[in-house]
Amino acid sequence: MKKPQEMQTMRRKVISDNKPTQEAAKSASNTLSGLNDISTKLDDAQAASELIAQTVEEKSNEIIGAIDNVESAVSDTSAGSELIAETVEIGNNINKEIGESLGSKLDKLTSLLEQKIQTAGIQQTGTSLATVESAIPVKVVEDDTAESVGPLLPAPEAVNNDPDADFFPTPQPVEPKQESPEEKQKKEAFNLKLSQALDKLTKTVDFGFKKSISITDKISSMLFKYTVSAAIEAAKMTAMILAVVVGIDLLMIHFKYWSDKFSKAWDLFSTDFTKFSSETGTWGPLLQSIFDSIDKIKQLWEAGDWGGLTVAIVEGLGKVLFNLGELIQLGMAKLSAAILRVIPGMKDTADEVEGRALENFQNSTGASLNKEDQEKVANYQDKRMNGDLGPIAEGLDKISNWKTRASNWIRGVDNKEALTTDEERAAEEEKLKQLSPEERKNALMKANEARAAMIRFEKYADSADMSKDSTVKSVEAAYEDLKKRMDDPDLNNSPAVKKELAARFSKIDATYQELKKNQPNAKPETSAKSPEAKQVQVIEKNKAQQAPVQQASPSINNTNNVIKKNTVVHNMTPVTSTTAPGVFDATGVN
């Protein structure tokens, strides 16, 4: 008998020997459960594949059915088109037969009319017979044979000849053919079938058209995920965006164009006042008042004279508004004249309205007019001189003269009536009437332009800054232009006007000499105010702003180098990304 100690040792041995078997069984059990999971997943995948296949099959059947419907609709449409073509062909044949029949009838009628005209005799009159009988001296013996033979002859048959019976025969009436019930029934059945076929054709075409549109939308939605209507809306939106972009571009182009024009006018005003006046035309007085106000405000701002700055702003605004009001009145007069010219018989009235407005505008502002406007003013003055204006025009002319006088008195400008007498103006009119129309018009135009040039120069000289070399040259050129106008020989035909201009020029000459006397040492403008110098200043300013950034960059590079050279090592705990028990628990015993 074994001892208990030996039995305990044997029990341990049995347990130790059974451990591989238990581990194998456990491993087999785990493997089996894994296989079961895989089998379940495969079953699910197979079921999903079958479901997908079934869905694909159903959708394929639906697509095939839709294609069959389309084919049937197309075939019905083709059949309907063929039926329509046959019907049209039958109608064309019938129309052709009718045309041929009408043509043959017309040919026959034409030939009969030609024969009738050719065989028709000329109607004889009794004039020749009466002449012959009167010329015969012997009386003709009449024969009574016809009277004796007449009763012996049989009576003639009555003949009712219609003159049109030979080529317009009366058609014989044809009795209508009686149709049998069978033929009538067949005809009605044919008509019924024809109407049913046409009705079916109409419905087929309508259905096919609607079906084609729906199929087109479906195809476009399948291919492009977009319908035709949505594409049209997108095209509209694109067109709207394009229109907005084009509009913005046009606005930018117009803004640049007018900005360049304004800059060019500013440069001309500072360097060549005579050319500035001729190029700006009716806009010259308004631009001159704007530029004068800006220069004066700029000078007072730099000097720090705030009281003078306020006065300059108010005066400049008043001048600008005055010139703008005169320009608006001229524009309204031109618009009224254009409307009157459209009305028949109102051309002369339109010329009077526009000529009066141009004359008042030039006398008030001193604007330089173009050749066409100068001729309109001269023609109006010529009509007024000859007394060709109506009573209404004369009344309006008096009102305009009163307005111009009041405006000149408020602004301290001399009126042309105050510099000459009525007798001198009357004598001048008589002298001008003796000239030819062309010479009279030329004299009036030269006088108007010379007076306007003097008004412009007076305004320019009052605000000219003689400390600038460019302004001094511009004033001298404008003064020389006035002297040339005064020496124009055409002004000799207008002695009163020449006296008026001489009085104005004497004041201008005194003002000019005063400007030359008090003129400071004119110096050319510094190069710092030129566009190139301003551009250089902007570039230098940008470089100065970028310099601190460029100086700070080396320190940043050094810091990066220090960071990159750091070799400190940190001991980190090992970490895994799996769900295993870990490195330290992996050596444990069950």
Curated annotation (Swiss-Prot):
Residues 176-185 have a biased composition (Basic and acidic residues). Its main location: virion. One of its GO terms (cellular component) is virion component. It is found in: Virion. Residues 1-35, 147-185, 515-535 are annotated as: Disordered. Transmembrane segments: none annotated. Serves as a base for tail tube protein polymerization and acts as a template for tail length determination. This is Tape measure protein. The gene is 29.
